[in-house]
Regions:
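Oxyanion-binding/catalytic loops of NTP- or PPi-dependent enzymes
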Residues: 1-75, 79, 87, 107-827
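Conserved AMP-binding/adenylate-forming core of the ANL superfamily
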Residues: 87-96
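Non-catalytic, mostly N-terminal accessory regions of nucleic-acid modification and defense proteins
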Residues: 98, 106-107
Length: 827
């Protein structure tokens, strides 16, 4: 019997289930818990602990532990266990938890090569995070693996538990993320109408709110502590232990009106030598006030998802709550009341995602490379002198199915056919054999139901046919449509302007396959150090596409082929697939060199887009400054409440201290910057004409103050003529304006790039901005080469060094960052 496995790899807890097509089974931890804390603890002897033991010890000895690393998946943030001098990646940590959970399975399931495993990821996960999860599964030694979005898995769990038609909303609030899914069920078939969520919203944020707003103020009032308490490494263990105590108090408030955050001894003294302890009364009312903002954020996410689906609350029958924090009644009541939708607790909130993942795993064609879904249509060719075949629905969600006769030849008069169940002995009786004849069969059990077809001649004698066996799988539910959670595109340059060619748009049904053609923007010679870069971005910002989040770079390097040259303008044929999970697969062929480059090999790299959030405070500060300057410029001419919202997001982001090393705090700040960018993009879209005028005026002012003196007379005249052309484009609402503007900016850059002193200034800035470079060693080597070039007055070499620095720099989305653009063009 085949078994299918589902793993909910959670921020706080993980769970694993199996499904054999009929029955679900949850595998408990050795401690007999339904879920296993996603925690690793390594003692001073190097022994590893997982689960509850690891989580409890992590509170007392945080430098020996790794927790909540799921939030850092897809980034270059190291997970440091300083006490044992071990540094792990988030992928390595996740691999340990996957290996642990997979080990709960019986040996016959683990070692069966046919076992397929679905690992769930939040809908808000981007391509880098999904790739990191697949890497973790490979490290864990799990065989056949596919990813699935957590809200889809939750929907499958709901469908397994309760039949019935209608629209329902899944509110999946876990330890780290919020996922919202809206689904419609009709006769056992379910369509996802829309999904949304918040990447950094979960139980961990509730814990941190208690720590920041109750515990820290109490400590500062009670004891003599330094002003830099939050970032002072001396107090790291104390604060981690306090956070654990806050979390335990939060859990107790699910069943009590009042509790105490208590730690009799935190093994730390204050500046006056007094022993530090915790003894803080907290009420349910206190907690409600602290988490109100996050609950409001989750309610707004649900409303936005309803809007995406084109639905009102009146169209939705119930909210199904999933995830540990939804145990809290105040949260459930508040969400249901604000949305005016009835609350439901029909699934186990702690295990629903793992259960649904196992059910979904049964629907995957594990023999296919793309891990697509099994076909819902079945057919057999019985052959013979009748050219006989039978068509049927191979995977119905209900208890009945029809088998249809297809005749290609002439049938003998009086011929009949019959269908028997090999499971129950049921028989249909004989029915006249003719094209289009049908027999309805009963599916007696979930999973595979096997039938055999018999054919008889006019005298009742058996007629030999070829294939006569039909297997129909009665499924728990059938997913008709999975919408894409985001828009994903490839950046191209068009007349100097960056544009996105979309592979998939938000809410497009998945999976999606297609073919796109591009051209090389520059030549690439075999074995050279250069590359052609397909920059993959996620988002809907169209006028300034580099404001969209970069999620990876597919690079064809000169070292990837041994002979020939890809000439500028050469055709690049890109076959792509966006899978059910939202993962992107790219294969690029280059006819001119007969080359083929596939993303599942070494050519797809996440490194260019990853951030180390343990060392990102300077980068965040720079991003905040850039976006704030843009917002201030727009606010001088336009009054829009979204600008105030964007500034509020930036204020939150700018509160990160310059020496902040907590990855979660830094990542939340960067997410706030991304939200501010989206709000600004919305304002630009709604006020396109005045925004265009501002952009043109700014570009002209820059030319007049910084560039005109360096320009040749013909260049200045040409620039002025192009300005007039751009102005006419604004006045006539022409779509060519952005092309003209980018050409103007490009001319500014080209003139400045000729000036040696400008190149030196740019080099000095890049040499100092170490936080903008993931590969610090390569950055240092290039800086050394640049300094040597300056000493030798070799400015052409310096220009080459600056170009290389830009190519490995984390893109800030700055319009003046002209060297950071992709180098492929439209076909």
């Amino acid at each position: 019997m085949k078994n299918y496995v589902g793993i909910d790899l959670g921020t706080t807890n993980s769970a694993i289930c199996s499904y054999d097509g009929e029955n679900l089974r949850l595998y408990k931890s050795p401690d007999q818990y339904d879920v296993t804390p996603s925690a690793i603890f390594i003692d001073k002897r190097g022994k590893k602990y997982f689960g509850p033991t690891a989580y409890e010890n992590a509170a007392k000895s945080p430098d020996n532990a790794a927790t909540k690393f799921k939030r850092m998946m897809g980034t270059s943030t190291p997970v440091r266990l300083a006490a044992v001098d071990i540094t792990m990646t988030p992928e390595e940590c996740s691999a340990e938890i996957l290996k642990l959970c997979f080990g709960y399975l019986p040996e016959e399931i683990r070692n069966n090569p046919d076992t397929g495993t679905v690992i769930t990821v939040p809908a808000a996960f981007n391509q880098m995070q999904k790739d990191a999860t697949m890497a973790a599964a490979e490290m864990a030694g799990i065989g056949k693996v596919a990813l699935m979005q957590e809200p889809v898995a939750a929907v499958m769990s709901v469908m397994k538990q309760r039949k019935g038609d209608g629209v329902f909303l899944v509110f999946d609030l876990g330890g780290g993320t919020l996922d919202i899914a809206i689904a419609e069920s009709i006769s056992g078939r379910v369509s996802l109408l829309a999904h949304g969520g918040v990447a950094m919203c979960g139980g961990a944020d509730f814990d941190r709110s208690i720590l920041d707003n109750i515990v820290k103020p109490w400590l500062k009032n009670k004891f003599k502590l330094p002003d830099d308490l939050t970032v002072n490494p001396k107090f790291k263990a104390m604060l981690r232990h306090s956070l654990y105590a806050a979390e335990q108090a939060k859990i107790r408030l699910s069943s009590k009106e009042e509790t105490v955050i208590t730690v009799p001894d935190l093994n730390m003294t204050d500046d006056s030598g007094e022993d530090i302890y915790l003894d803080i009364t907290i009420t349910r009312s206190d907690l409600n006030g602290l988490i109100a903002d996050k609950i409001d954020e989750s309610i707004n996410a649900a409303r936005e998802t309803l809007d995406k689906a084109g639905l009102s609350p009146n169209d939705v029958g119930r909210i199904v709550f999933v995830g540990g924090p939804t145990h809290y009644k105040f949260l459930r009541d508040r969400v249901a009341s604000e949305l005016c939708i009835e609350a439901s607790t029909e699934v186990n909130p702690m295990t629903a995602v793992a259960e649904g993942a196992a059910v979904f795993a049964e629907s995957i064609d594990w023999g296919s490379q793309s891990r697509g879904r099994k076909s819902t249509r079945g057919a057999i060719s019985a052959g013979g002198k009748f050219d006989l075949g039978f068509n049927y629905v191979a995977r119905p969600p209900g208890s009945r199915a029809k088998i249809l006769v297809k005749l290609g030849g002439t049938v003998l008069a009086g011929a009949e056919f019959q269908v028997d169940s090999l499971d129950t002995g049921w028989t249909s009786g004989r029915v006249a054999l003719k094209d289009g004849a049908t027999i309805e069969v009963m599916l007696s059990k979930p999973g595979d139901n096997t039938f055999k077809v018999f054919v008889f001649d006019a005298s009742g004698g058996p007629v030999s046919i070829g294939d006569s066996k039909i297997v129909i799988a009665r499924t728990a539910a059938l997913v008709d449509a999975i919408p894409s959670s985001s828009s994903i595109g490839i950046e191209v340059t068009e007349k100097g302007r960056a544009e996105l060619v979309y592979l998939v748009r938000e809410l497009d049904p998945l999976p999606v396959k297609g073919k796109l053609q591009f051209r090389a923007g520059e030549s690439l010679r075999a074995q050279s150090t250069n590359s052609l870069n397909f920059v993959v971005r996620e988002g809907e910002i169209t006028d300034q596409v580099r404001e969209n989040r970069p999620i990876g770079v597919f690079s064809i390097k000169g070292s990837d082929f041994y002979e020939g040259i890809i000439s500028q303008g050469a055709a690049l044929i890109c076959d792509f697939e966006v899978q059910d999970s939202g993962q992107v697969v790219l294969n690029v062929s280059v006819p001119s060199i007969s080359g083929n480059f596939e993303s599942h090999r070494k050519f797809y790299s996440r490194q260019e887009s990853q951030i180390d959030f343990s060392d990102a405070s300077k980068q965040i500060a720079e991003e905040v400054e850039i976006v704030r300057e843009r917002i201030d410029g727009v606010a001088d001419k336009i009054n829009d409440p979204k600008l105030d919202q964007a500034l509020q997001k930036l204020d939150l982001a700018s509160s990160v201290q310059s020496n902040e090393s907590d990855p979660e705090t830094a990542k939340q700040a960067m997410d706030n910057v991304e939200e501010a960018k989206k709000l600004l993009a919305d304002v630009r879209k709604s006020n396109i004409k005045p925004i265009r005028q501002m952009d043109l005026d700014s570009c002209v002012d820059f030319f007049n103050t910084a560039v005109r003196e360096q320009a040749r007379p013909t260049e200045a005249n040409s620039f002025d003529n192009l300005v007039r052309t751009a102005q006419r484009a604004i006045d006539s609402n022409s779509g060519d304006f952005e092309n003209h503007l980018n050409e103007l900016r490009g001319r500014n850059w080209q003139i400045l790039w000729r000036q040696d002193f400008i190149v030196v200034d740019i080099f000095k800035r890049l040499s100092e901005e170490t936080w903008q470079f993931l590969d610090r060693r390569q950055h240092a080597e290039l800086v050394a080469a640049g300094k040597e070039a300056i000493k030798a007055d070799d400015f052409e070499k310096l220009r080459h060094v600056v170009g290389q620095l830009y190519s490995i720099r984390i893109s800030s989305g700055d319009d003046d960052d002209m060297l950071a653009i992709a180098n492929i063009t439209r076909y």
